[in-house]
């Protein structure tokens, strides 16, 4: 029954999806849902819209709560996670991560894989005195990142259009044509989402990032690099050992075992960020929510609020 309803809804959506003008008008009509209470039913509507290939349309920015007490304007894009800003009052994106961050404070934040800037904007709102460095190599995602930063006047965020890798230079970046938020330096990962566009992007190494560190300051490093987390962490080895930052890492596919083999991470305690709350773990494993928080063993007193 559910699949039948999904197919029927998709068939209806395909009619306005036939042109940019009708698609834009039709999708804008869904903005009325923001006036209704959030719930799982909104995700059901999102799913039906995701079944259709839409032309590229421009939708107006929409204000939504990113975390309790912190609202921002985001530009929504149908088929991408930021489209939730068009439908929801409160963004449903990664609540486990946002809950972990809620009671923490940092002076310096390095976000690797900033994408369209959801967390960059949130960090800027939550920690207006912090210095935030956001790295995103994908051209489309970076353009959207800049747009969202400008909309929210995020003056304490410094964006960089580049990747982080073992060596500085230029690398091939693979961007799935219909999944722009899943671009990666790992071709096999990107191709799992369909055909890819290949571009050359600049890269910095951990040595260059070390210059951004302010010794003795509270630091967070957040990495969401679609499978390249182990390589990035190895590039940042000197910085991590010297500054002992807190970290949030996305863990997917075959990444867990690679992370478990990184010796300097044994100086950290690991917490799976789960819907029911953080759960300490001895090793990395692939979980449904995917994200881990890492806290230096010497600084663990306030790891779990």
At which residue positions do the language-model features occur?
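Conserved SAM/SAH-binding beta-strand->alpha-helix loop
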Residues: 138
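Short internal loop-to-helix segment that lines adenine-nucleotide cofactor pockets
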Residues: 86-110, 170-172, 186-243, 254-257
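Core alpha/beta nucleotide-donor-binding catalytic domains of modification enzymes
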Residues: 146, 150-178
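Short aromatic-enriched loop/helix-cap "lid" or pocket-rim segments at secondary-structure transitions
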Residues: 170-174, 185-186, 261, 282-285
């Amino acid at each position: 029954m559910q699949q039948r309803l999904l197919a029927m809804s998709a068939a209806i959506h395909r009619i306005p999806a036939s042109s940019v003008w009708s698609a834009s008008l039709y999708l804008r009509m869904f903005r009325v849902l923001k006036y209704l209470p959030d719930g799982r039913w909104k995700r059901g509507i999102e799913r039906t819209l995701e079944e259709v290939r839409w032309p590229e349309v421009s939708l107006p920015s929409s204000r939504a709560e990113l975390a309790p007490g912190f609202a921002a304007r985001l530009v929504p894009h149908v088929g991408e996670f930021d489209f939730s800003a068009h439908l929801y009052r409160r963004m449903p994106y990664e609540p486990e991560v946002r809950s972990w961050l809620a009671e923490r404070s940092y002076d310096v934040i390095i976000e690797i894989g900033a994408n369209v800037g959801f967390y960059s904007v949130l960090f800027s709102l939550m920690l207006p005195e912090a210095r935030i460095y956001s790295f995103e190599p994908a051209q489309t995602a970076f353009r959207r990142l800049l747009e969202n930063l400008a909309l929210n006047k995020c003056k304490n965020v410094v964006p960089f259009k580049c990747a982080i890798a073992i060596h500085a230079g230029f690398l091939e970046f693979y961007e799935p044509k219909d999944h722009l938020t899943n671009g990666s330096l790992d071709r096999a990962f990107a191709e799992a989402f369909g055909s890819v566009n290949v571009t050359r992007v600049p890269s910095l190494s951990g040595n260059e990032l070390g210059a951004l560190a302010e010794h003795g300051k509270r630091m967070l490093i957040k990495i969401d690099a679609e499978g390249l987390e182990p390589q990035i962490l190895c590039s940042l080895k000197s910085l991590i050992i010297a500054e002992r930052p807190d970290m949030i890492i996305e863990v997917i596919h075959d990444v867990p075992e690679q992370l478990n083999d990184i010796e300097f991470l044994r100086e950290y305690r690991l917490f799976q960020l789960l819907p029911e709350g953080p759960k300490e773990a001895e090793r990395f494993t692939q979980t449904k929510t995917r994200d881990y928080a890492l806290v230096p063993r010497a600084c663990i007193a306030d790891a779990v609020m």
